[in-house]
Amino acid sequence: MQRILLAEDHDDNREMLMRRLTRAGFEVRGASDGQDALTHALAWKPDLVLMDVSMPIMSGLDATRMIRAKLGATIKVIALTAHAMNESREACFEAGCDAFATKPVDWPNLMEEMNRQLRFW
């Protein structure tokens, strides 16, 4: 079973996505801020992280940079953000994200991107 870490600071969004990911057959853990995401990623080593870009304590981009510094590219990271501007995409890729998805989440597109990332891992 593939392991997904969902880093999302909004409780309702995190719980809803965790339920959907669990029903889709993934083992899922949640993180409510960037520091929590970093801690879980380093300890649990999921196959993929869905990383909200804007979170308290540590941003998703800073958490991604730290994951990359500690673990390299061993974990796939998909950035989740409400900002679809090119600058936002570039910032995500510069931080080390493998892919980019906008919020609100388009479930079929997110699943397609997750499958693409996990297949090439």
Task: List PLM regions with ranges.
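Short hydrophobic/Thr-rich beta-strand motif most characteristic of the beta2 strand and flanking loop
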Residues: 25-32, 40
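Receiver (REC) domain active-site loop signature in two-component systems and cognate sites
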Residues: 55
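Short amphipathic alpha-helix used as the core "switch/output" element in two-component signaling
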Residues: 39, 61-74
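Charged docking surfaces used in two-component/phosphorelay signaling
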Residues: 15-23
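C-terminal output helix
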Residues: 105-114
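Active-site beta3 strand of CheY-like receiver
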Residues: 44-50
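Acidic catalytic/metal-coordinating carboxylates
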Residues: 9, 33-36, 59-65
